[in-house]
Amino acid sequence: MQDRQKAQDYRALLLADTPLIDVRAPIEFEQGAMPGAINLPLMIDDERAAVGTCYKRQGADAALALGHRLVCGDIRQQRLEAWKAAYQRFPNGYLCCARGGQRSHIVQRWLQETGIDCPLIEGGYKALRQTAIQATWQLAQKPILLIGGCTGSGKTQLVRQQPNGVDLEGLARHRGSSFGRTLNPQLSQASFENKLAVELLKINARQTLKRWVLEDEGRTIGANHLPECLRERMAQAPIAVVEDPFALRLERLREEYFIRMHHDFTHAYGDEAGWQAYSEYLHHGLFAIRRRLGLQRFAELTDTLDRALAEQLSSGSTDGHMAWLVPLLNEYYDPMYRYQLEKKAANIVFRGTWQEVANWLKAQ
């Protein structure tokens, strides 16, 4: 057996993007997994549920026997071939189950019978998860600087350019607003937190870190919420506010939401289905804030959106979208953000255009 038979240096494993062959049931994997893990379960959900019920009623020996009866013959062989293929693809990988218990040991033993010595994570996913939680808490204690500004100010781009910048929206796969979803579905809360922890660990390991640079976010980014330890620190953090001309903000939003999203949808689904998905995406974003707009205003902007989509479909022009985007910014997004920023006015340490804020950051 290899020297790396069991692993307890969890931070090193996370920092190295160590491939994990996660043998938990799909439902467990969906609830939370580590970045880079692939789910090749020993038991699928129904099998796991049956074994769990048996364990409660008849004890461990009966549950283990049932598990072996459920995963035998062709089913066992198919799963074994999948684990072998995964190990051949990731020879530096580790087996991982919930706590480093029966499931990963069984898979390890079956692989040994074929001549493959695959190490396992001692303590399993639970140990890695605790390491991620502790790392986030520890690293969140470092100083933080927030980048603020109204929608379309280029905050995310500015954060990404900083060597100590953490793109929270990229990690969450969501841009924060009602139009913020991307083509990639959001991760579960635990998986998002795990991914954030690994990102913090990596950035911290690359350099002598004086502070984090983050975008000024609310408690939630789409369906994901920020860890409370980080959110508490952000609430007290200094803020550099980007104040770009309205016309420049509109051009950024045009590029991001009308040109790039249209391209991404059609690239993913084809012209016809992609257009339908793009149209539904814009309608859904507007629908999500209908009560805050008022139903009459929502209906008016929806009609304008429909006309803009018809124009874009027929001519390729995105100009028509300005007729509903401009009032949406003026009547909803800008007042909302300015109200939120006003409550944190004492934290503002710099204001300027995007380039001025970028230059200020370099000088710090």
From Swiss-Prot:
Enzyme Commission code(s) on record: 2.9.1.3
Keywords: Selenium, Transferase
GO molecular function terms attached to this record: transferase activity, transferring alkyl or aryl (other than methyl) groups; tRNA 2-selenouridine synthase activity
UniProt-annotated catalytic positions: 97 (s-selanylcysteine intermediate)
BP GO annotations: tRNA wobble uridine modification
Top-level taxon of the source organism: Bacteria
Entries under PROSITE patterns matching the protein: RHODANESE_3 (PS50206)
Catalytic activity: 5-methylaminomethyl-2-thiouridine(34) in tRNA + selenophosphate + (2E)-geranyl diphosphate + H2O + H(+) = 5-methylaminomethyl-2-selenouridine(34) in tRNA + (2E)-thiogeraniol + phosphate + diphosphate; 5-methylaminomethyl-2-thiouridine(34) in tRNA + (2E)-geranyl diphosphate = 5-methylaminomethyl-S-(2E)-geranyl-thiouridine(34) in tRNA + diphosphate; 5-methylaminomethyl-S-(2E)-geranyl-thiouridine(34) in tRNA + selenophosphate + H(+) = 5-methylaminomethyl-2-(Se-phospho)selenouridine(34) in tRNA + (2E)-thiogeraniol; 5-methylaminomethyl-2-(Se-phospho)selenouridine(34) in tRNA + H2O = 5-methylaminomethyl-2-selenouridine(34) in tRNA + phosphate
Pfam families according to UniProt: Rhodanese
Domain Rhodanese, chain residue ranges per copy: 14-137
Assembly behavior: Monomer.
Family recorded in the similarity comment: Belongs to the SelU family.
Protein role: Involved in the post-transcriptional modification of the uridine at the wobble position (U34) of tRNA(Lys), tRNA(Glu) and tRNA(Gln). Catalyzes the conversion of 2-thiouridine (S2U-RNA) to 2-selenouridine (Se2U-RNA). Acts in a two-step process involving geranylation of 2-thiouridine (S2U) to S-geranyl-2-thiouridine (geS2U) and subsequent selenation of the latter derivative to 2-selenouridine (Se2U) in the tRNA chain.
Record-linked PANTHER family: TRNA 2-SELENOURIDINE SYNTHASE
NCBIfam families xref list: PRK11784.1-1, PRK11784.1-3, tRNA_sel_U_synt
Protein's name according to its UniProt entry: tRNA 2-selenouridine synthase
Source organism of the structure: Salmonella gallinarum (strain 287/91 / NCTC 13346)
Name of the encoding gene: selU
